[in-house]
Every structure is written in structure tokens, then in C-alpha cells.
């Protein structure tokens, strides 16, 4: 089995391993690993500007992402003193497979007044140490995303509606490189629609066509909790909403727009 999601394959290129395999097709990636990889590249582009906080990441999934070599380009659309806007593109097999935008802000300590409504921020239902081990229903003998991450159930149950699941990387996103906090969030956040599914994935497709993550701060530690629910509209559309926590409390939110079809 591979020991990372991606291996560097030259300047601006990464070879995906089988640990990126998703639930819908054995030749396609789960969108979590490439979203994590692009978060890494956006932060690398922002670092020379002194910007380090990934406040927002939006990934528009144009087509299935193959388990193949990926190329990523990042452009600076605007850079100010306190924040910069970036756009990016992910390519594979001579096609653009995803594109998106990101906002990276400058970190600066700020003392807030006591007693603000809604604060202190809420915590996850249970810490990972008190949560039971989880298992994806699409796990199989073939390596895939379910082998890339370890999961623990803090509330509810996987694929049975609203739930809260802790995620921890078993392997790095890029071979030989320590995972960034933003990568830990992105690789987990794309699972919101899966863990909170209310339709049988053997009978229905409910694939997300995008992923937007908004962060108050980076996570601390290895564990990230996704507290998710899935909602469906009347015309083959859906929405997965997630709260994102680390062991200290709420750190952000994520949304996914879903296309729903009978198999």
C-alpha cells in the first residue's frame, strides 16, 4: 500500500496514489485529498507575502478527478496588506478537472471583550478519546480514502443522517512532508455529504460539485471533527452543511452543493 496521498512528480506536478480513491468509481479520487493539496499550494503562494491564515477555500469540481498525475497552478488575483485573493486550476490527463478561489489573511493577535454573544465557541459533542472507532461503508480490500484517514464517531452514525465524525490522517498528503493544519481540514471537510448521507449510496448518487470551507483559525492537533447534515431539494439538488471543530472548539464551517440521481 502507498504511504501518502500524493508523490511529487516534478515542478507543479503530483502523482496520486490509490489512497485517494473515492467511493463512486475505482478510477476516481475522493475530492478531499486534491482539495488538501491545493490548500497547501495556495498557502505556499501566500507565504512570501506574510499571509498564513486560509480564511476561505472554494473548490469547483468540474469533472471526476482521475487517480493520475495532477498539475496545479495558483494565481494571485489581488494582494493587500491584510489579505490576498487567489485563483487556482487543477489539471489531469490534459483536462482541467477543478478550479477555484481562496482568501488568505494576515494573522494578528486581537484581544476581544468578554461576554460576546455566542462565545466562547461551542465544542464538538465528544473529544476523540471518548469517541468510538468509525468505518466507511464503502471501505474494501482495495486501498482508498478510508485507509488514508482514521475516523471516530462523536455523535450519530455514519451514513445514517446528521452526525459528528472525527478525522485524523493516517498518512501524509504529500510523501515526505508533514501535513499542514489546512490540509487536515480540507481532506476531512469533503466527507460531509458522505458521513451524513440519508440515501442508500448503492441506489443513489449524491455527488458534490463543489466544496467551500470558511475557517476562523487553523486546527490545533491531529484531529478534525466534521459535524454534518445533508438536505435535499425537490429537483435533484442537495446541500451538505458541516461545522468544523478541533479539540478546543469550533473553527469553521463547510458547504457542498450536491447533484442527486438514482443509479
Regions found by a protein language model. Give the residues of each.
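Terminal targeting signals and extreme-terminal segments of soluble enzymes
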Residues: 1-263
